[in-house]
Amino acid sequence: MAKDGGAADPLRNPRFQEPSVWQLFRESLFGKPRLLDCIQVEVTSVCPGRCVYCPHTTQAGYWRSRHMEAATFARLWPLMQESGRVHLQGWGEPFLHPRFMDFAALARKAGCRVSTTTCGLRMD
């Protein structure tokens, strides 16, 4: 029980609940649950497609295609450590980013599952 009467104090916080035996058992097997279920990261806005619904097409005069810098992705490390999954996608084709596999490896190193969405146009 917290000495300062904070959120962990059941006498001062009616929403406080002691962890159940099941919760303690599950945490002993799998670790504490992560704060975030998933974070989605747009690693690139570069795409060869011209889909009618996409900003590449609908906002062609304003759209800037570019890759995320590796240093920017690295700054997401604290969030990745609190997330169960990192989804690498966005309005671009993620496999066109030259560091895609490095980004996926960093997310795995943080303990995340990694997923992506691709149009598959450049899978050669």
PLM segments and residue spans:
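Conserved alpha-helical substructure of the radical SAM core
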Residues: G6-D124
